[in-house]
Every structure is written in structure tokens, then in C-alpha cells.
Amino acid sequence: MKDLLKFLKQQSKTEEFNGIKIGLASPDLIRSWSFGEVKKPETINYRTFKPEREGLFCARIFGPVKDYECLCGKYKRLKHRGVICEKCGVEVTQTKVRRERMGHIDLASPVAHIWFLKSLPSRIGLMLDMTLRDIERVLYFESFVVIEPGMTSLERGQMLTEESYLDALEEYGDEFEAKMGAEAVLELLRAIELEKEIESLREELPSINSETRRKKMTKRLKLIEAFFHSGNKPEWMILKVLPVLPPDLRPLVPLDGGRFATSDLNDLYRRVINRNNRLKRLLDLAAPDIIVRNEKRMLQESVDALLDNGRRGRAITGSNKRPLKSLADMIKGKQGRFRQNLLGKRVDYSGRSVITVGPTLRLHQCGLPKKMALELFKPFIYGKLEGRGLATTIKAAKKMVEREVPEVWDVLDDVIREHPVMLNRAPTLHRLGIQAFEPVLIEGKAIQLHPLVCAAYNADFDGDQMAVHVPLTLEAQLEARSLMMSTNNILSPANGEPVITPSQDVVLGLYYASRKCVNGKGEGMVFESIDEVEKAYRTGFAAIHAQVKVRITETHIAENGERTEARRIVDTTVGRSLLSRVLPKGLSFDLVNQNMGKKQIGKLLNTCYRQLGLKDTVVFADQLMYAGFHYATVSGASVGIDDMVIPAAKYTLVADAEAEVLEIQEQFQSGLVTAGERYNKVIDIWASANEKISKAMMDNLSVETVINRDGEEEEQESFNSIYMMADSGARGSAAQIRQLAGMRGLMAKPDGSIIETPIVANFREGLNVSQYFISTHGARKGLADTALKTANSGYLTRRLVDVAQDLVVIEDDCGTFEGLTMKPLIEGGDVVEPLRERVLGRVVALDVFYPGTEKVLAPRNTLLDEAWCDTLEDNSIDEVIVRSVISCNTDFGVCKACYGRDLARGHIINQGEAIGVVAAQSIGEPGTQLNGWRTFHIGGAASRASAENNVQVKNAGTVKLHNAKHVTNSEGKLVIVSRSSEVAIIDELGREKERYKVPYGTILEKLEESIVTAGEIIANWDPHTHPIISEVAGTIKFVDMIEGVTMTRQTDDLTGLSSIVVMEVGQRPTAGKEMRPSIRLLDASGEDLKIPGTEVPAQYFLPGKAIVNQDDNAEINVGDALARIPQESSKTRDITGGLPRVADLFEARKPKEPAILAEYSGTISFGKETKGKRRLLITPADGGKPYEEMIPKWRNLNVFEGEKVERGEVIADGAEAAHDILRLRGIHKVANYIVNEVQDVYRLQGVKINDKHIEVIIRQMLRKCLITDAGDSQFLAGEQAEVARVKIANRELEAQGKKPATFDRELLGITKASLATESFISAASFQETTRVLTEAAVGGKSDKLRGLKENVIVGRLIPAGTGYAYHQKRNAALAAKASGKTSEQATTITASEAERNLADLLNLAGSSD
């Protein structure tokens, strides 16, 4: 009966709420929660262990200490339930009420709540429009504040020191009222009339000009409105009554030896009660003011410490010098309530153990130790034993299991059959870190794991442990089987490729089996079937590598599923024909008729999955694995010291390098090269020596000479074990073999600089002491980096999950026509990512036409699968507009069409899929593989960048220019006169093959649309200077060019040529400060020439340091350089790479020296210069007001006076800031920028992540906007709001014919975006808990529980996956209820009524016994 009651209570609790509201508690509300006032600081009586009356653990207030038993023992047993004992005043009920009953303390003097005071921005300060310092001075009794000025010259809220207060008293008597302490603040807050205040602020706002004041007013207005709408009263921020936490939540536990362990809260409460009681006594005694004040201040401090210890002043410490844990500390941080207990719970029916290999398991199985299974499945076993009649009671069943009688094992087998268990390995970085398997009982104590799932778990068998969880309910078992079974998780959610590819031993075995060798036993034999081959191999007539001819039978599966068989004879080897036995029907023999390296096996599995589906692939993967292990064993491949063959050429190469180094050293000593050059040269010499040695070594290792059938020598690929391991991709790489048999090479110091003497020895020769010592540097740095990297990567993942957790697919199609334009990614001469990889699995947003026609090739809303991608490639389409989550119109979610294919399943995504979390995991999981700090070991990268001075094409094709302005010079070549121009090479099908950026002043050797051949150089430029190109031909006229004032003449000693150098403003004499040196171009009659197509005279202004090679009155042609500006570039900017770069992008951090972009389209001119800055003016083409910007002088400008720029063009080079791109070029450009930049980092490490995942995060970064004009909406101009909210409001306004609000999208970093979510529960559990909760409470916010995190925290199914349907049903029911409220009312019965009825029944039952 009791359980039934519990059940009823529970039911009513979980179902009845749809949101959680947080607000301020009024004193009356606190009293209404309370079951009595706590008056004494005592806890329990140390002799009797009974709680003291009216103390912190009082049984009268909080409830009985033992179930159904009052304190004095007069009433015991269930039948007295609900009686209040007249002797001790304790209600007879369950002890559990001590966990929920609260008490209260009536404070003798009001106290400010520290959260609303000190949590910035201070809410009390904002409300009273006073500074925090002033309020603190009032609260802590340092000065008075005027409350009622009366008929005096004082103002309300004015601060008075002790002296000035006394003066005022003398002057005005009791005309006015001034107080100090929290009472004063309370009165000030009480005096605020919210409605009037709102009206006056709204009237005042438009007339304020100062930006800072307007911001402050808007903040204050928002706060007061929040108070007004939420029904909170400002004076509730001051506490008059302090609630007391139920005692079982701050327990006092007796330890052995008569001591007690207590929660810190008890100490904190004790201090408050002590001080409060002392203050009451002092007030009764009418003690002197100064004593009372001191006591009030101490009370305020003790309440501060209870609520949030350490926020103000020094933290109160306990006996052991550590700060006490206050209420705020209980909920925040990793160990706080949110993250420790609500988001991460420990679960029952779980166990953990070490893992070992289970090479004989099938893919869906795992080996579970019998001991563990017995413990995990106990309840099921008890049930079965009873059901079969082997045990009469549960107790008997328990005994049987403890004795481990034989029948128990039979029952266990029965229980386990078809009952999946879940295996998890920490850290669970992505969803493949938990998978379900069918258990197979094994002896021993270690869990056996299938080798193929190791990659997904990132598990190895060097002592890793794993946890087992048992899904109990039928639904849970069903979900585990259909969604989490390892066989259903073959593809990786990050990139859609198989994640169960074989590695290591399996690869080595398959590679060994598929190799061929010359003159193997049985070479040249012909077999009529694969059975015959096997017979010959087994009887020893043919060796596994022998080259033979075999007749094979292949099955072809047509589009419609028809199967046809075909036979043919192939040249192959014995091993390959044996491997083809495990090949499923429908795959071509050619897939195994090659050396099976890791790449080939991966491709084989992928092909199998795409052509034959899931089931066949799973079976095939298992068979491949068994075969691989078998042949690896047979091969006898091992690592021996003689396998590391040192090339003979090594010693001569090392000697040569040493000689070269000596030569450089001599040059340096005779002063021919600088120290830096010497260092770089030496490092280059050793690097190239290392390359040569390793090439010699690999050439040596990779082939061996054998005698063929005809008795002649022949070279064949080597069977050296080490070479085979590296070549197959099983383990090791050329770089590692180089260290074994070549030379170790150059080593880096811990700070990253390269030590110039390399280690010439290798591991086979062994290192000497100094070499070994140098080696240890790198090793230790590697370990330290890894540890830091793991922490950083984990934190990035956490932020990503938090920002994206509430993004779920919630509708089929939002109907948008927008999308992202996808083109192949081309960098220089390489296609980095072809179009098919970018659009595979996406939905077309706008019809794709056959090139050059109006005929539709792929209609809108087509999901592009592999077949469609082939079609696009065949028709050489190189641009498709696809749907993207960034442009999806769904509010609070996305639609299926904008997301496209679910990568882990290979079909279009389902509703309810939690794409946000999947995206965050996919980006965060490879984080540990990214390198910690900066990429690119400077050396290779730096030297290449400096030499870029031409474009050499790799493929033949046609030249095409992108956004390039150009003029033709006297030689008939094109000269580029625009920024950010690109030249591309197009093949005969119109597909772009290469694309290069070319700077201003590039001379093109080829005209547009001309044909080039591979290897031709098509563009040249000077990388070290920035030319100023003349766009007209004419005569040069110098303006403001005065020798010694604005310029100097310099003559080159070697060549004898003189040139003019413009002086920098700072170095000019006073006369030259205001002058603007420039070159004008005149025509033959001495008139100003105009720049073609405009009315602007051709006048070129020269910045400081410009070198002019022409003289006054010289003739000049179009496209010639008037002057050159030396570039102080190629200061190798440290390229941030790896994790920090990804984090910077997602946090949308501003780079140190951002590129300056043009805010408007128009014409450039320069205004008056200040000390360190230039004034840049942009005059719009329509003649509007010029926009001006101050730019530091040291920035290299890309533009000249009179040049036209488009909005968003780069004016000064630098790293582009994402915010600027969004503001000036729009949402699609910023999305492309972030996606490409993030992908660059991952691509460098060879990690594949689908663009979709990054787009999902970007959508979350863009979900806020800034209201520019409120229209008729309830928003304020300048307010930050959720885009979806604004859109919904605008739709309503438009429907009513009112003016909608206008807004600008805003890009927030992921941390900011997480904290700015609508759900305060989610934000509070992420970071800055105090600030989030304070803000939410003041605004009386209500959490609609829309995201996943909030629902986990309140203990519900999440609104995604299988919980999605449950939430949809609930919402439908709620909607129905809202529309048809009245009808149902009569029949329902509330839980409390049911409880009363049950109580009566129980009492009847109780009294009858």
C-alpha cells in the first residue's frame, strides 16, 4: 500500500509541470515554506545524540529522526501516523520529511542578499542608480544615505558621511531622514514605483545623446521592466527572513571516537544565529549605536558568507584553514549540484573490468566474465529461479545464487540470451564510445572486446578498463538492440565513412596473403575453380604467393536487384583467390586482386556497404578479420635486428654534409654570411642529407633480388618484415623506419627551435650519451603537450556540446530557397576537396541546370546521393547551391531538408535526431589529434612563402580571371590593378582545376581566355615591393615634392642610378608636415588627365618610404610603375594552428591585428593626419556623407587615393575578423569563412569532418540578433534578442499590419552563446552559475525546458531520439487541454485527495490490527 502511495505521488510530480520558473522569494513566502523558526545555534545533544529543541536539527520543526516515532518515544508504529506528540511536539511521520521541511530565521535587522549586490552588474545598484561602492558603504555602516529629504536641499539617495550627517542634523533638525545599513537600502528600494519609473525612462531615452548614458539607461529600463513583468518586488533583494535548509541536506554524522563530521553549512548557519540572537539582545537592551551597528555589520557579513562565501572580503575558514563551502559553492562548478549530480549520475546494474582481445567473437558479441554476469543479472536470475519452481521464495533463490549451484548457470544462460549489454570506455568523446553487444559468458575476469570496434572506442589492450551497463526494461533493451548495437554503427557520424576498418595485425595478414612473389612454388599453374586452388595450397603443391591463373565465378547485381553470374579466367595469386572466398556475392574479384593495404581494405568495406547494405558488410568484416589474423600468424612476420638494413651510402652522405657545414662555418667566420643565414643553411644541409639517406634506405629495403624460373636475376618487392608493416599501413611509417635504419635527424629543443647538430646515429647503431640526452628533450615535451592537449580538447568539446545541445530536427521542410553555394575547394594547383565530397548527402536548394542550358538536371529538393554526385561530375557541374542549417527557417530547431543525410545511417535524417550534440562530438572528438599550440615547424613553410613571385600552372587549360581590374601595358601584357584578384585555370569541360591569388601589380604573361600548357609561368610580380601602377599614359608632374622637405634623392653606389625616396611625415621638417607629395599625370597640352571612366583627375598620392624611379616631366605608359612601396612584410606571422585556432574561430575572437575592411562602397581619400594615425575617408558613389576611419600609420594600406572600393573589400591586410565579415559581407560569407578555416586545421592532420557539423555550430553562434529598430514590437532598440523570437513576433505584427522590428544578426562565440540561451537551467549548469541564476531570478524567468540539458536535469526523457515522440504527445495533450479546459475538470482527482483517501484506508487497516 505504501508503495502505491509513493507511486501516486511520483506520477503527479513528474507529469504536472511544463516549465520551471525562478524568482525572488518574498519574506511571507519564506515563512510559508517554513515549519518553524530556528532560534538556537545548537545542533544535537552530544550525550544523547538527540536534536536540541529549536536548534538547527530540531525534530519539532523538521520532523522525526526515526520513521513513525516521536522524539520522546511516546508514539511509535504506523498506526499513530500524523499524530503530534503533546510532550515533545514532534509529528509522527517518515524521517524522509527531514529532507524537505525547511525552517527559517527571523533576522533582527534586514540584510542585503550578496548575489544581487555583488554579482556584476549589481542589480541593487542598477535599480537605485547608485554605484556599488556607495551602496556597500551604506550597507557596511560607513556612511548615511538620505531616504526622505523633506523640505531640505538634500536629495534622495545622497550619501552623507558621519560628519556631514551631524552637520545636516544641526542645520535641518528632523526635517529629513537619513539612515545606514540594509534598512536604508530597503526603504530606498521600497520607494521605487516601477510603473512610473518605466514611463519616465521611456520618455527620457530618445533625448539622450551620450552613447554610454543611453546604454546604462537601457540596462536600467530592462531591469525595472523585468521586475515589473515578473511580479518581483525590488525590496525582496533585501532579506528580512532567512530560510534554513532541511537538516538531512546538511547532515551531522557521528564518527567513531565521539567526533562528528558536519556539513560546512551548519557552521555558517550557527554564526548567523549567534549573531542574530546577540543583536536581538542588544536591541532589547537599547545598547549604544556603535555597538549595535557593529553587530549588524557582522550579521550582514555572516549571511554573506552563508550565501556565497568569499565573494566579499576574505572567505570564512573552518578549523583546517580551508574556506567553508557555502550554498553558492554547492551548486556551481564541476563538483556542484548541476554537473556532479544532475548531469552525471552513477547508475545501478553496472560493473567495470579490464578488457582483453576477443578475436573469435562476432561483431555483435562481447565476452562477459561469468562472475560479472551473475552479479549484474541477479534480479533476473531470482525471477527465473522462482518462475521455474527451482526456488520457492526470493530468499531461497538468493541462497542458491550465493552457493552457485549448477542450476544457476543454466538459468543465467537463459537470462542472458538476446539480452544486450552496453559497453562504455571513458573518455566517451563521441556516441560510438557506448555500444551494445550480446554477451557471451566466459571464464576469467576480463571483458573480451571485438577487435574491430577498438577504433571507435579508441581502446587498446594495455590495461584499459571498460564499464558494462545492463538495460533493464524491454524498451531499453529494444533501443540498445536497434540503435546501439555495434552492427548498426558501422559508419562514423562525423564523416559517413566506415569506422570498423581493420588495422594492425589484420591488415598485415591480408597484405601478406595478397602479395605475389617471383618463382613461388607452383608458379604458372592453372586452376578451374577456387576449390582447386585451396586443395593445391593445403596439400603444399602451391605456395601462397605463387602467381597462377584461376577461373572464377562473379555475381553481378543489377539496379533492380537481378543477379547474373559470369565466369572468367584471371591472373592472380593463390593467396588472393583464397581471400576471394570471403568476398560476398555481388562484389568484383578485382577488389581483392591487388596488394591489400589499409587504404584498399577501407575502400573494399565502403564499396561493400554502399552496394550490398549493412548485413552483408557486417558478416564480411568479421570474415576479413578472421582471415587477416590467420594469415598474419602463418606469415611469421617479426621484427629482427637484421631487418633494419642500413644503406651503404649513409656514411658518405653524412661525411659530405659535414664538409658542407664546415664550409659555411668558414664563410660565417670570414663575414660573408650572417649568423641567421648560417643557421638556416646548416639546417637545410642536414635536412636534405636526411632526405637522401632515407631515400637510399627505402630503395634498399623495398626491393630484393631473386632468381626467377628461367634462372635469371629479377627484382621484386621485398618481403622484409619491417617494410611490409609500413607498406601495408599496419604499423609504422617511413619516418619511423628512417630512425631505425637511416639517421635520427634534426631534433628540436623544448622551446621549438631546432638544434643544428643532428643525431647522425640510428637506433640500430645505438645512440651515445649526448645523442640520447638530446632525444629525451623531445620525448618529454611530447608527454607534457599531450596532457595539456587532452584537457584543452575536452574543454572545447564541452563548450561545443553546450552551445549546440538544444538543436534537434523538428520538421520535414521549412521551405526556404536559400542555401550555401558549394564549389570545389582549390588551393593553388590542387583540388583540396572535390565538389562531390562537399555536396554528397545534401539537398539541392535551387534547380541545377545542364551547363549552358535552361534544362533542369537536378530539381530543387533532390537529396544528392552517390549516384547523383556521379551525374553531376559527368556533366562537369562545378557549382551547386545546397540547403544548409545556417539558412534553415525553422524556429528553435532545423528541418530535415536543410540538414540532408544522416551520415551514420546513410539516408535522410529523421525527425528528433539530436544533430547539435552529434556535431559537437564530431568536432570535439578528434581534438586530441590536433597539435597543441602552433602548427608548421617553421623552416619548410617560412622559406616557401618568401619565394612566391610567380604562378606556374600544373594542368593545361584556359586562363580565367576573378574579380580583377586590369590595364594593358606597352608590351601588350595585362597588369592587375585590383586587390584580392584571382587567376584560375579551367579545363575543357569548364571545371576549375587551379586557382591562385595574385597581388596588385602582377604582370600576366597570358591574356584571359588564352590556352596554357602545363608548367607554363603565367604571372610574375615582385614580392618585396608594392607598386603604384599608372592607369593612363602621359607626362609626370610632381606635386609637393621638394627635396629635403618631403623627399630625398639617393644614388645607388653599385649601379649609379638615382632614385627619389619620399620621407615619412615624422621625419619631415615642419614645412613638410602638411604637404601631400603626389604625382599628377598631364596630357600633351599640360591639362590634367582623368582616370578612365571617371571625372577624377589622375593624381597618385605617395605614402612615406615610397621610391620613385621616374623623374619630373618624364613620359610614362599605361601599366608602368610610377613608384614602389617597400613591403616590410614576410615577418613570418606566427600561424596559430591546431586546437587554439579552432577554439579562436568558434569563440569568434578578434585577431590581434585584424584586416580593415571597407564599411561602405565608394571612393577613397585621405584627410588630415594625426600623430600616429591616418584619416581615411570613403565617399559613397551617391554623394552621401563621407565615412571616416582612423588607421594607424604602420598598417600597410592596400588602397590609394581616388581608388574605388566595394563594401567589405580589404583596405589593410591582416587576419580577417569574423564579426567584420558578417557585418559587411553577410551571413553566407561568414559561414564559408569559418567552415573553411576550421577545415584547414583538421585537414592538416588528415581528419575528415563533414562541413555540416561546423555549420550546425555556426547556426548556434548566429542565433542572437541586435534590434536596430523596434517598430511596433515589444523589443527595445539596441537590445539583444533571440532571432527566432524576433521572427515569430514579426510574423504576428505583419499579420496585424503593424511595423515589424528590424535587426542585425550577431555572431557570438560559443561560450557567450551558451550563456545567452533562453534556458537558464542550461546556462547555469555550464558556467558562471551565480550570474546566470541572479539574472534569471530578477527577471522572473521561466524555463520552457526545450533543450536536452534542461530535461536531463529535471529527470525527463530528452526531446530527441526516442524521447521526441513522448514530448510531441505531451505537447499535443497540453494543447488539447488548453483548448478544452472545462470538460475534463469534473472527473480528475488530485494526488492530495487520493493520498487522503488512502490515508483513511491505512488508518482503518492500522487500527484493526
Swiss-Prot record:
Zn(2+) 1 binds at C70, C72, C85, C88. One of its GO terms (cellular component) is DNA-directed RNA polymerase complex. GO terms for molecular function: DNA binding; DNA-directed RNA polymerase activity; magnesium ion binding; zinc ion binding. Mg(2+) binds at D460, D462, D464. SUPFAM superfamilies: beta and beta-prime subunits of DNA dependent RNA-polymerase (SSF64484). Pfam families: RNA_pol_Rpb1_1 (PF04997), RNA_pol_Rpb1_2 (PF00623), RNA_pol_Rpb1_3 (PF04983), RNA_pol_Rpb1_4 (PF05000), RNA_pol_Rpb1_5 (PF04998). One of its GO terms (biological process) is DNA-templated transcription. It catalyses: RNA(n) + a ribonucleoside 5'-triphosphate = RNA(n+1) + diphosphate. It is an enzyme of class 2 (transferase). InterPro entries: DNA-dir_RpoC_beta_prime (IPR045867), DNA-dir_RpoC_beta_prime_bact (IPR012754), RNA_pol_asu (IPR000722), RNA_pol_N (IPR006592), RNA_pol_Rpb1_1 (IPR007080), RNA_pol_Rpb1_3 (IPR007066), RNA_pol_Rpb1_3_sf (IPR042102), RNA_pol_Rpb1_4 (IPR007083). The keyword Nucleotidyltransferase applies. Zn(2+) 2 binds at C814, C888, C895, C898. Its cofactor is Mg(2+); Zn(2+). Keywords: DNA-directed RNA polymerase, Magnesium, Metal-binding, Nucleotidyltransferase, Transcription, Transferase, Zinc. Binds 1 Mg(2+) ion per subunit. Binds 2 Zn(2+) ions per subunit. Its EC number is 2.7.7.6. The keyword Endoplasmic reticulum does not apply. Gene3D superfamilies: 1.10.132.30, 1.10.150.390, 1.10.1790.20, 1.10.40.90, 2.40.40.20, 2.40.50.100, RNA polymerase II, clamp domain, RNA polymerase Rpb1, domain 3. The RNAP catalytic core consists of 2 alpha, 1 beta, 1 beta' and 1 omega subunit. When a sigma factor is associated with the core the holoenzyme is formed, which can initiate transcription. DNA-dependent RNA polymerase catalyzes the transcription of DNA into RNA using the four ribonucleoside triphosphates as substrates. Belongs to the RNA polymerase beta' chain family. This is DNA-directed RNA polymerase subunit beta'. It comes from Shewanella violacea. The lineage of its organism: Bacteria, Pseudomonadati, Pseudomonadota, Gammaproteobacteria, Alteromonadales. The gene is rpoC.
